[in-house]
Amino acid sequence: MRIAPTLLSAALVAGLASLSGATADAATPVHFTSAHGTFTGYASGAHAVTYRTDLVPGGAQAHVFGTSAHATGTTTALVVTGLLPNHQYGAHAHANACGPSGDDAGPHFQHTPDPVKPSVDPTYANPRNEIWLDFTTDHFGTGHAKSTVDWTFGSRRAHSVVIHETHTHTDAGHAGTAGARLACLDVAF
């Protein structure tokens, strides 16, 4: 049943491209990004790393597609396959690239950075200031999510998408938290 994820990925790319082209001013440059990886344990040069094979098995895959333009903001889509069936995961854009530990990806990328670390204030840790891609897998272990924010990246950029253990909390003191960091995919936002 590998054709369904491939068709879903193609549909997401086409949808993102049509969104950016239909509303973007002709003089507004559109930035596209795409990343794909098959999760493995960490090794030097790995771009898709699993830290918890019980929740993100080796061989699971992730695809990230994104468009960004001043006229439309930033839209990011995530498609995953091979994860646990019927499971809720959190996922976010993170400030750093993947590394040997999930912590190496750094904090969530925030358009307006929270001066307090770690950031758990819903004023900063929210789906308008961060890229949140929470999803629930189907009975095949396939999931997808889309985020649209009204800002674009400047000189500071996110460098990865991290899959977390649970959906993202929104309450004060816990905003932006989503449990353990399970896996990481390098993305050149």
Predicted regions and their residues:
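N-terminal leader/targeting pre-sequences
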Residues: 2-88, 93-189
